[in-house]
A protein has these predicted regions:
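Exposed, low-structure sequence patches enriched in small/polar residues
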Residues: 1-246
Length: 246
């Protein structure tokens, strides 16, 4: 079983950009080079209301897959990111996004969940298809996202815990400015087929679901689409004899 699991890829990136206006004293080297988040110095009384800015981002992701057989491949990926931006006036904007899936049509219940892709090859050996196709495969994939944003003024909220995000969402519902859940099955079912004489045919059935929540209300969208394409490639040439006198 271990040999069928693709390598697991883990990634984590954290960036902090900060500016402080009219600082008094010598700035510590650790703050200059980035391993100290605070400079520990006072700012001039003449600085006014624009003390500086703060921009903190954290991104994490994990990717892997499983080759169930020579013909069946499944890949997974999950990502989550947070950002916190504090302007010079002290207003803080926070945003988050993560892979997500809702389990009911009204998006009332859901959970963090990785996106996936599935491919079944060897379909050209199926009855009927084997008479017309040189190669054929079936595809299916899912990608879902939950995104939220908050605005804080005259209050310092707790830090967002990477593993306890639900607690932060519940505790700060009054400060939430927008939220969106998007689920894309692209394709819900896809079919690829290569015929004789360099003819290729594809078919896709896509399904997209989304929920937008704003202070003015909720909007739910459900879209279905069908696409089909066919292409033909011709390769050929001609030979022209050239006389040679020697």
């Amino acid at each position: 079983i271990v040999n069928k699991v693709n390598p697991i890829s883990l990634s984590y990136t954290e960036t902090l950009n900060r500016s402080s206006n009219q600082v008094i004293g010598d700035v510590p080297a650790g703050y200059k080079f980035g391993w100290m988040p605070e400079h520990g110095l006072v700012q001039s009384s003449e600085v006014g209301s624009n003390l500086g800015s703060w921009d903190h981002k954290r991104d994490g992701s994990v990717r892997s897959g499983v080759k169930l057989s020579r013909l069946i491949t499944v890949n997974f990926n999950f990502s989550q990111n947070f950002s916190s931006v504090i302007s010079g006036s002290g207003i803080e904007q926070r945003t988050m996004s993560r892979d997500y899936i809702a389990v009911d049509e009204l998006f009332n219940t859901g959970m963090p969940f990785p996106g996936w892709s599935f491919r079944l090859a060897g379909v050209e050996k199926w009855p009927l298809i084997k008479w017309v196709a040189k190669s054929a495969s079936i595809d299916h994939s899912y990608a879902g996202k939950e995104t939220r944003s908050w605005q804080f003024e005259d209050i310092s909220p707790d830090d967002i815990n990477f593993f306890k995000l639900a607690n932060f969402v519940d505790d700060n519902k009054d400060y939430e400015r927008s939220s969106r859940i998007n689920m894309n099955f692209s394709p819900l079912i896809g079919f690829n087929m290569s015929l004789k004489k360099n003819i290729s045919v594809t078919f896709r059935h896509n399904r997209n679901l989304s929920l937008d929540e704003l202070p003015t209300g909720l909007t739910i969208r459900k879209d279905h689409s069908y696409t089909s394409t066919a292409s033909y490639t011709h390769r050929g040439g001609m030979t022209i004899p050239l006389p040679y006198y020697g």
